[in-house]
Amino acid sequence: RRPIGLKGENVHYIHKPEQIPALLTEIGLPLPRKLAIEWDASHGDFTRLSAVFPDAEITNGSAVMRKVRSVKTDYELGLLHESAVKHAEVYHRIESVYHNGMTDIELQIEIERLLRLHGNLGLFRINGQSMEIFMGNVICGDNADTPTPYDFAMGGAGLSCSIPVGCNGSLIRPGMTVMIDMCGNFTGYMTDMTRVYSV
């Protein structure tokens, strides 16, 4: 998302937005008359950018940014493919870390360990206010019916009411189905894979 070491005519590095006006002046560009900001940006970011460009008209740039992000370069597609291949390799090993008597959290920890050992970066970004999850979600039994207040396809009560999603310490019993929805981030581009296993 923020690569370093890029070179090119229009590549300039800054440490904070307040440096942008001086940079634009230095390279001979005018300050913007209109500034598009994503509407789900924090109030602090909105206020800060507005102060950097006090004469600019602020407009909603959410739709434009979503459209820009939806189109991937060949380089980005390559990174997504690389991440997906590694993600799939880990999923082929999930059965090897399961043993009788495990809880959902114990299985999730083993899957997280596999992911990290295979190069998963361990950091995931979720779009949306106050939505958090660690590396994914493993749910089984009655917990699979528990709704979450988050805008996720899967629910689960979670281990704490402060993060109400995911595994809750349920014992995985014979005859149960286990839904595994773990994130892959091996290249800076996220993949998501969901599988259902029968015990």
List each model region and its residues.
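A composition/biophysics-driven feature that prefers long, compositionally simple stretches
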Residues: 1-90
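Short, acidic (Asp/Glu-rich) active-site segment that either coordinates a divalent metal cofactor
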Residues: 2, 59-62, 69, 73, ...
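Residues in well-ordered beta-strands of folded domains
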Residues: 36, 112, 198
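Flexible loop/turn segments at secondary-structure boundaries
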Residues: 44, 133, 186-188
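General structural signal for alpha-helix termini and helix-helix connectors
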Residues: 67, 93-97, 199
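Active-site cores enriched in adjacent His and Asp/Glu residues with nearby glycine-rich loops
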Residues: 87-176
